């Protein structure tokens, strides 16, 4: 039924053709069941495990690797001789990598799907209905309830469907609907129509929503929606419709993968075509097909070389390390890729209650009457310190500390606060904090009594548990609470009837009243001044109301409560407590005692965090279900708005936002910094508009209602105290519910991205080198310098360790002084691409050169000519060009070992180059990142392991090297540092002359300026070693003449 909240009870009952006392007939139930189906949320049809697994292989690079593995497997099957076993190692290793990557991917996807399932925990098992087949109420399964059913709910019940209340069977009906609307206090319901068809859920006071809890009272109502048509069902539909966006990094890697796969395909085809002329060479037994297969194997090796297999593992490790660092700062990251997305967050949409504020109501101001002269009066105003539920704080008057026991008015005010109250404080030993038991407003009054300590109770030596309610206990010992007149909407107040514990002629029964100031003061006839009772004149009333109005608006927007007493109420026997409409008659002739002003105070550290966000170019938007006045006041307090800023185009209520045209809504989202009185659908809309401006949005939320927006935003942030649905729909959970934690996480995200850029570039330059190596050997006609199983070892293990260590590079000091990076900026710019191409070409040439050195110039080598080496496939005993050459030498493991050792050593040097994008190694020595030094040592140790420990050399087709050969490896490898230092110098001084450059690039640099910041220990250690290395004899020059 649409807009049931606007209709009268009679209209709703007539619509369903049902009688409130008898309920639906079985015939009606059957028809309605057929029309509307079961009252349950359908189980989410998630992807099957097989679908999820197949999805992981949709990536182009993964497909190329899979193809390479299949081809390698087929070729290994037909391999003959000794190599049969080693031939199977390569496809097996590739498949192992792919399986590991797929497992990680499937696990992450599965996590994302749990959010929709978690909604089911809010479905009640049973419901109580009236139907015509039975005279009394009957319990049935909640899933069998249909629209039109008459349902009964009582305290503790979970509401089984969306219900229009028809009658309330208790004084009041309070409902905790925080999971749906985010309201922190329970809501009082009624049966009157709410005439506004566009009312938000918070304002539908005559409705009960499925999944919410009855906090107090008992009621009956008619079901108006079941299953997916309920408010919680609509949230489920919205979540199902929300597709997870890929993170900026995932998009970058997808683009990179596509480009790389095109390049790989081209290079593989090129290598194959270049060598068509060699297909018939004698070494292939003159068989064209064998020759084609041989070069096909080389093309497969190329594909394996070009793909950075280690990249997914290194990225996952780096992000996992990042999540551990974030967890220490109370940010628990649920989805690894979102760690990096945090780094480019440009807008943070934050909830007010509990995130920007403490969600711990506290009294900060109060007043009593000081003097009354005729029609005018003066007030004693006090301020109270302390912004949490901890019972510690001070009371000040005119900025001076005072003792509350010296003011009779304050003693009476504290008495009313303690007795007209059903809440208390509790010390949670596990968390080490004081918590509320009961309503937030009443707990604030309990806490105020503790801070006032009006009877000067000795609090020293009390344990924290005893301290929680010590002062309240003293007051409660003086008087006994007989009964409570519950709060009702018509009088907007509640009261307690108390009798003295020690009866005497002077002490008598009293009624203590608290409530909304305008309602209570209208029923007051006197005011309390000290111990005296003075008639309330219109002048005094005006003065009191003007102060209350002032407190309720402006910067503070305090929630004010008036406190009053009835000095001689009727005897309890004379009072009719059955009918709550009589209560107002007993709360008349009151004496006004004082007023307290309370608020949910901002967290102390939030203002500095918002300042940091402004420096970092991040816009903070407050989104709250609270009213606009309070929201704007808090915004001014914490720095989202400056003190006297005009907010007419920067703060909107949900209603105001809906009334704007689409273009105006879009414009509002571009400038607004505060949205008040919003519903969940508004949050999703705001996220959509922000995404249309290419903003990367972080959205906080804690209720079920926030789940769709959390899922839609790039970074959904749930509160640690929030619902399971919100947590499972989010990417990150704030363990301490604190806004400042988000800012710390953004800073960490930025640092992680910078480090990630470094190691992605490092790994890619390594792959470029491998591709160049294989391309050169094929183009020059040399024997294979590297085989796929060696390439996999380098890509995964020896490169993987330093790449992971680069994730520990220290963050830049000015990381939060820069605007958020553009998520569309390329991972590798044009200049950087040239740099890595240059480095890669050197790596490839050096690797091939090392293999050629063994053939042409090494002492223990065959010392063949360049021609013989480049035409080795024509080597036969009867070929005059190869007289005196044993053709078996071309299958020796030495050249491969030289090539692999040079590749590994160059990569270690390259890791040192990656310590900083543009900073010289002489200024940023290796020990700046001690993890990197350790990783390089470990990688070299693993390389020695495969060289010198049996049977590993057989698997990798390599052999141990002697000292001369190792010296040659170092000679060929070290120049890569010089090459990158030159490229860094060009970048620093000519392409990106920024803060680092001491002198303008045009002027020659003076010696003192050039050597400033140089790490002399590094220079003194490395220079003699380099000079010694290049002075040793390794027949290097014999290669060239």
Curated annotation (Swiss-Prot):
GO molecular function annotations of the record: ATP binding; ATP hydrolysis activity; metal ion binding; P-type calcium transporter activity; P-type calcium transporter activity involved in regulation of cardiac muscle cell membrane potential
Keywords: ATP-binding, Calcium, Calcium transport, Disulfide bond, Endoplasmic reticulum, Ion transport, Magnesium, Membrane, Metal-binding, Nucleotide-binding, Phosphoprotein, Sarcoplasmic reticulum, Translocase, Transmembrane, Transmembrane helix, Transport
Chain sites annotated for binding Mg(2+): 351, 353, 702
Residue pairs linked by disulfide bridges in the UniProt entry: 875-887
Binding locations of ATP: 353, 442, 489, 514, 559, 624-626, 677, 683, 705
Enzyme class: translocase
Membrane topology of this protein: Multi-pass membrane protein
Lumenal side: 70-89, 274-295, 777-786, 851-896, 949-963
Positions bound to Ca(2+) 2: 767, 770, 798-799, 907
Cofactor: Mg(2+)
Spans traversing the lipid bilayer: 49-69, 90-110, 254-273, 296-313, 757-776, 787-807, 828-850, 897-916, 930-948, 964-984
Residues where Ca(2+) 1 binds: 304-305, 307, 309, 795, 799
PROSITE patterns: ATPASE_E1_E2 (PS00154)
Record's catalysed reaction(s): Ca(2+)(in) + ATP + H2O = Ca(2+)(out) + ADP + phosphate + H(+)
Chief location of this protein within or outside the cell: endoplasmic reticulum
PANTHER family, per the entry: CALCIUM-TRANSPORTING ATPASE
Subunit structure of this chain's protein: Interacts with sarcolipin (SLN). Interacts with phospholamban (PLN). Interacts with myoregulin (MRLN). Interacts with DWORF. Interacts with TMX2.
Domain writeup: Ca(2+) and ATP binding cause major rearrangements of the cytoplasmic and transmembrane domains. According to the E1-E2 model, Ca(2+) binding to the cytosolic domain of the pump in the high-affinity E1 conformation is followed by the ATP-dependent phosphorylation of the active site Asp, giving rise to E1P. A conformational change of the phosphoenzyme gives rise to the low-affinity E2P state that exposes the Ca(2+) ions to the lumenal side and promotes Ca(2+) release. Dephosphorylation of the active site Asp mediates the subsequent return to the E1 conformation.
Name of the protein described by the UniProt record: Sarcoplasmic/endoplasmic reticulum calcium ATPase 2
Gene: ATP2A2
């Amino acid at each position: 039924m649409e807009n049931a909240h606007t209709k009268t009870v009679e209209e709703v009952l007539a619509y369903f053709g049902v009688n409130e006392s008898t309920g639906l007939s079985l015939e009606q139930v059957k028809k309605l069941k057929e029309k509307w189906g079961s009252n349950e949320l359908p189980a989410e049809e998630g992807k099957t495990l097989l679908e999820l697994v197949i999805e992981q292989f949709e990536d182009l690079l993964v497909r190329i690797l899979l193809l390479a593995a299949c081809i390698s497997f087929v070729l290994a099957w037909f391999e003959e001789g000794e190599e049969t076993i080693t031939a199977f190692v390569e496809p097996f290793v590739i498949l192992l990598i792919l399986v590991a990557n797929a497992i990680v991917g499937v696990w992450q996807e599965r996590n994302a799907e749990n959010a929709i399932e978690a909604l089911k925990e809010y479905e009640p098992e049973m419901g109580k209905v009236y139907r015509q087949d039975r005279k009394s109420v009957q319990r049935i399964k909640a899933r069998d309830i249909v629209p039109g059913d008459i349902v009964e709910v009582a305290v503790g019940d979970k509401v089984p469907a969306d219900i229009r209340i028809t009658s309330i069977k208790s004084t009041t009906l309070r409902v905790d609907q925080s999971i749906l609307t985010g309201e922190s206090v329970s809501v009082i319901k009624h049966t009157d129509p709410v005439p506004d068809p566009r009312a938000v859920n918070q304002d539908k006071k005559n409705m009960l929503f499925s999944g919410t809890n009855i906090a107090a009272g008992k009621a009956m109502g008619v079901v108006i929606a079941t299953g997916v048509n309920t408010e919680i069902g609509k949230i489920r539909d919205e979540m199902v419709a929300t597709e997870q966006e890929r993170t900026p990094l995932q998009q970058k890697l997808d683009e990179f993968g596509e480009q790389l796969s095109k390049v790989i395909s081209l290079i593989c085809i090129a290598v194959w075509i270049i060598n068509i002329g060699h297909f018939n060479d004698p070494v292939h037994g003159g068989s064209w097909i064998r020759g084609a297969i041989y070069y096909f194997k080389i093309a497969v090796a190329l594909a394996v070389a070009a793909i950075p297999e280690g990249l997914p593992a290194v990225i996952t490790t780096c992000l996992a390390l990042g999540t551990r660092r974030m967890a220490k700062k109370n940010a628990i990251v649920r989805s690894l890729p979102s760690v990096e997305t945090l780094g480019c967050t440009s807008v943070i949409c934050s909830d007010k209650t509990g995130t920007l504020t403490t969600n711990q109501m506290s009294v900060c101001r109060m007043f009593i009457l000081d003097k009354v002269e005729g029609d005018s009066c003066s007030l004693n105003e006090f301020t109270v310190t302390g912004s949490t539920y901890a019972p510690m704080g001070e009371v000040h008057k005119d900025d001076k500390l005072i003792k509350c026991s010296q003011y009779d008015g304050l003693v009476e005010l504290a008495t009313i606060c303690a007795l007209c109250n059903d809440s208390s404080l509790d010390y949670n030993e596990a968390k080490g904090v004081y918590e509320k038991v009961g309503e937030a407003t009443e707990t604030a009054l309990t806490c105020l009594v503790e801070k006032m300590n009006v009877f000067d109770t000795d609090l020293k030596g009390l344990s924290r548990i005893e301290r929680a309610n010590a002062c309240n206990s003293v007051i409660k010992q003086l008087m006994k609470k007989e009964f409570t007149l519950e709060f009702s909407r018509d009088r907007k107040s509640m009261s307690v009837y108390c009798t003295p514990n020690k009866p005497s002629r002077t002490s008598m029964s009293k009624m203590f009243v608290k409530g909304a100031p305008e309602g209570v003061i209208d029923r007051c006839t006197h005011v309390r001044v000290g111990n005296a009772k003075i008639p309330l004149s219109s002048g005094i009333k005006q003065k009191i109301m003007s102060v209350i109005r002032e407190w309720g608006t402006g910067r503070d927007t305090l929630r004010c409560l008036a406190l009053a007493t009835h000095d001689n109420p009727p005897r309890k026997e004379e009072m009719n407590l059955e009918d709550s409409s009589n209560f107002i008659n007993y709360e008349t002739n009151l004496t006004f005692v004082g007023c307290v002003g309370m608020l949910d105070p901002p967290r102390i550290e939030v203002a500095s965090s918002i300042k940091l966000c402004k420096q970092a170019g991040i816009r903070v938007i407050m989104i709250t279900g609270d009213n606009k006045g309070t929201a704007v006041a808090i915004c001014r307090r914490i720095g989202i708005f400056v003190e006297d800023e005009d907010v007419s185009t920067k703060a909107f209520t949900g209603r105001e936002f809906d009334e704007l045209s689409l273009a105006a809504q879009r414009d509002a989202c571009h400038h607004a910094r505060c949205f008040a009185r919003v519903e969940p659908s508004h949050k999703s809309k705001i996220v959509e508009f922000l995404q249309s401006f290419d903003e990367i949005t972080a959205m906080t939320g804690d209720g079920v209602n926030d789940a769709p927006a959390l899922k839609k935003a790039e970074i959904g942030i749930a509160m640690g105290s929030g619902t399971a649905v919100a947590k499972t729909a989010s990417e990150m959970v704030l363990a301490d519910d604190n806004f400042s934690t988000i800012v710390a996480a953004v800073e960490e995200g930025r640092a992680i991205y910078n480090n990630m850029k470094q190691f992605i570039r490092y790994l890619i330059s390594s792959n470029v080198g491998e591709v160049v190596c294989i391309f050169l050997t094929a183009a020059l006609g040399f024997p294979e310098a590297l085989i796929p199983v060696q390439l996999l070892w380098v890509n995964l293990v020896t490169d993987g360790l330093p790449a992971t260590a680069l994730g520990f590079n220290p963050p830049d000091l000015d990381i939060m002084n820069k605007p958020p990076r553009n998520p569309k900026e390329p991972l590798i710019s044009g200049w950087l691409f040239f740099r890595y191409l240059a480095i890669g070409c050197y790596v490839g040439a050096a690797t091939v050169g090392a293999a050629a050195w063994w053939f042409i110039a090494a002492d223990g080598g065959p010392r063949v000519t360049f021609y013989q080496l480049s035409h080795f496939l024509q080597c036969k005993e009867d070929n005059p060009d190869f007289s005196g050459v044993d053709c078996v030498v071309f299958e020796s493991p030495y050249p491969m070992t030289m090539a692999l050792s040079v590749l590994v050593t160059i990569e270690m040097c390259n890791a040192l180059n990656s310590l900083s994008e543009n900073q010289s190694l002489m200024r940023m020595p290796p020990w700046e990142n001690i993890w990197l030094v350790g990783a390089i040592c470990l990688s070299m140790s693993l390389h020695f392991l495969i060289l010198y420990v049996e049977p590993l050399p057989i698997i990798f087709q390599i052999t141990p090297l002697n000292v001369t050969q190792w010296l040659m490896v170092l000679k060929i490898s070290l120049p890569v540092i010089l090459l990158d230092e030159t490229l860094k110098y060009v970048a620093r001084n000519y392409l990106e002359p920024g803060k680092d450059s001491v002198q303008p690039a045009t002027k020659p640099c003076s010696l003192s300026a050039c050597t400033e910041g140089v790490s002399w220990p590094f220079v003194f250690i490395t220079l003699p070693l380099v000079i010694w290395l290049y002075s040793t004899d390794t027949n290097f020059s014999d290669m060239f003449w």
